[in-house]
Structures are given as C-alpha cells and as structure tokens.
Amino acid sequence: MPNGLIQQDSLRAHPDGVALALTLPWYRSLWLSSVSTISVTVDGEEVPPEDLRVELDGRTYRIDELPEQSETLWFLQQHPLLVVRRDRPPALGEAHRIGIAGDLRLPYMQIAPGADGGPGMYVPNVVRQSLDLTVRQGPDAAPALVSEAAPPPPATESDPFRLGLTLYSASAEFRAGWFDFDGLLDRVAELGIGPGIEIVASQMVPTYPVVSDDFLRTWRAAFDRHGFDASSFGANLDMGRRRDRDMTPDEEFEFSELLFEGAKKLGFPLVRIQSAKPELLRRLLPVAERLELQLAYEIHAPMGPNSEPILRVRETYAELDSPVLGFVADFSSTMHSMSPTLLRAVRRAGLDDEAVGRMQEIWATDATMRERQEEFIGYLRGRDLDPGRLGSFAHLAFNMHGHVAPSEWADIMPQITHVHAKFYDIDEQGQEPAIDYPELVRVFVEGGYRGYWSSEWEGHAFAELGEVDPLILVRRQHDLIRESMRSVAAAV
C-alpha cells in the first residue's frame, strides 16, 4: 500500500488550471486537520501556496486552512482535488513532472500528551513523491478479479474456532475504489470466507464516528444476503483531532460512547479498543454493560502479553475487576522471522543482500524496538546508505514484527476474547513463512479458546497494489487454520 498522495491517474484538467486527485496516504480515514501542509512542483517549478486549493465535498480550502478543519472527515475512498492555478487548463494526454510533499499526523497515535492544555505529539506521516504524469479524464478502471479458490469445507461443531476476517485485509483495494462496501462483502462471500466480519470503523464508515441509517441498511442487506456474523468493531480514539489541543477527558468519553453506540447498532458483540486509560475505562464500563458489549484491548507487535505496557493494562483490569474487559491477541506479536513481503519491499527500495541480512539479524535480538531500529539506521549510515530511501519501512520493520514466543498467549488465555490472525504471506506449501500457525493453533486449542479467529492480512503495508489478491490469501490462510485445528483435535 504505497505511501503516496498521488497515483499515475491523478492528473486532471480543471477550469482554474490543473488538478491532482489526492489519495489518502493511510489505511483509515483521517480528519482534514490531520494535514499539516502540502506543497507542489510542476515541471520543477515550485507552486506558490496561494495558488493551491483543496476541493472536498463541495467546499474549497486554502492550504493554511487545512489544520483548522477538525470537523471535516477525509473518508478513505474520497479523492479530493488539489487545484493548481495555471494560466490555462492542459490538454488531455499532456505530460508533466509533478512533485508533491505532504506532512500529516495520525490523530490516534499519540507519542506524548500535551502539556498545560497544549497539543500533544503524534506519529507523523511524511510523503515525498515525484512522478511523470499525463492528463487524464478520470481514474483508471479496477482490474477484473478471478476466483481461484474451491469452496471451503463446511464448519463442524467440533471445530474449536470460528473463522472470519477483518475487512482491513483489503485496505489497499478498498482505498483504490476497486470495491465499494457492498462489492467488498460480495467478494468475501464469493470466495467462501466467513462467517465472521470485522471492521475498523474509521476505515469503513463514511460518517465516522457516527453510524448512519444508510450505512446500517447497506450492512443489514449484505448480512442477510450472505449469512455473515458481526465479530469485532475496531475503535480508535482520535485524541489529536484538533491541532490546538488534545481531547479533554470528557471529549474522549463522548467520542468513545459514539463508537460504542455504532457498534451496538450494527450488531457487534465486541469492541476492539486501543486506549486503556484507567479513568476512561472506568467511565466507559457502564456504557459497555448497558449496550452489552465486550471491550478488548489489542496486544500488537512489538509487544506481547508480558511486555511492561501490557502488564500495566493487566493491572488496570485487575483493579476494575469487570467481566466486560478482555484482550485481542494479534499474531504480529509472535513471529519467528521477518515476512517475505517486507523483505521484497526493502529490496525494491534499494537494500542489497548484505543490508537485508543485517536487518534480520538485528530484528532477532532481544533489544527494544527503538534500540533495534536505531542500530539498523546506524548500520545503514555506516555504509553510506540513506535510511530515507526506505521511507517508513525502517520503522515498520521493527514495529510491526514482534518475536514473542507463542506460548506466552497461554498466560492470559482466559482473558482473550478475540483473535487477529495476522499474516503476510501464504507460501506454495500452504504455510505462513514467518508465523507458526500450527503452534499457535495448538496453544489456543489447549488453552480452551473458543472464539473467532479473524484473518488479518497486513501485507498491504509493504506490498504494491495489485501485487497479490489479499482475499485469495485469506481463503488460503483459512485452509491452513482449518487443517491445523482439526489436526490438533484429532490428536487429543
């Protein structure tokens, strides 16, 4: 899922000059206030900021107005126009070298809270692109998709887990407009995936954080048509929605309550949460109980069940002592090697075999994520290799791939209420080359887990759009999980 604001089909004619159809450079919707600044060059010439405008939903914004738009959602499938004022509109087929630089921040990924009522520090997303583009009338057509999977064997009462997927697995294709929401669910059904359906609300709900009646009708019609079952509703807390300050505790509560109500409206029994602030959880517990929702904090790489931050969450849970609280186990935490998808990506970015090998050696050590990342960047600089050529991969390689032992999940098994069956590849032998699925299945079967395993393909963080069909991979992963859990059951 390339981290770009523009694609090969982005350049359009506009009455005021030229326009660039922008793509949101992330996997979920963001507030327009998440955009700090955008600058453009055309054929090497810098465009003055006063000659740039953004058009979204019938409104026009100056670049310096964008950080103020905390009430305006840039939905993942929207492509606002960045209008560049020129003396004349270009002709169709006219070629130009377009450079674009965008600085964004991710409002739900807080590095440090603000002090004295000021804004906190948030994870940035920096985009730098330079592409040769030709003027087009509109976006490229989506490619035809081929069904290559035979019908799956039916689920049985003896299967310990129910299978499903998070629609996040098709993030890149959904963002590109290859599917609308209905079409995505139809494709899932066509491939025999399910019955569990999980969503990230900020990705799929156009009126986020509110679930509209129109979305509810679409949702119910698809579920009735295909016999799906709602498994997990992914909630974020957009603490940095405003640029001048963080959310207040009351705003955090109200925002979360809106999401919980949306989850209930869609029929979800469980909400995946990413904030475990004790006071916020204490206020939200009565809401969850009233709405009959389970709350599950996600344990994700680089952490595991016994990492220090997770131990603090476990202590908070013990203090609150509520049956509503649990965990989502994300298998990015328990990988035995780096994914081939990532290794292909860093090779495309220019790393040679020596650098790729050194990256894997550093990853396998027991140093902290930050220490490993800094050691690798130091190695690159020592070889006069620019870490910037890797973009976000220099960080994601160590942040998204954890190497905790699968057996550690047993330490919290009674509190695990949902599973993200994270994966990146399925090889020719039907195995995940970086994650030991037979061992994970054994740990969870023997630990007594009996909930959903929700497939989550996160290869889109590293793969190019169209490099693989993620939903075909999900079907193949389901075959692996199904075979593994039935083998364990047969051995008991």
Model-derived regions: residue spans:
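Gly/Pro-rich active-site loop or hairpin
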Residues: 174-181, 210, 306, 310, ...
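Hydrophobic faces of well-ordered beta-strands that scaffold small-molecule active sites
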Residues: 161-167, 195-199, 230-235, 271-273, ...
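Glycine-rich, proline-tolerant flexible connector loops at the mouths of alpha/beta enzymes
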Residues: 195-220, 460
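Active-site mouth loops of central-metabolism enzymes
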Residues: 166-181, 239-253, 274, 400, ...
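Active-site acidic/histidine proton-transfer and metal-coordination neighborhood
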Residues: 147-152, 225, 229, 239-331, ...
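Catalytic domains of carbohydrate-active enzymes, especially glycoside hydrolases
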Residues: 179-202, 261-270
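Boundary/entry segment of secreted carbohydrate-active catalytic domains
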Residues: 146-180, 234-237
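Terminal leader/tail segments of proteins
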Residues: 1-145
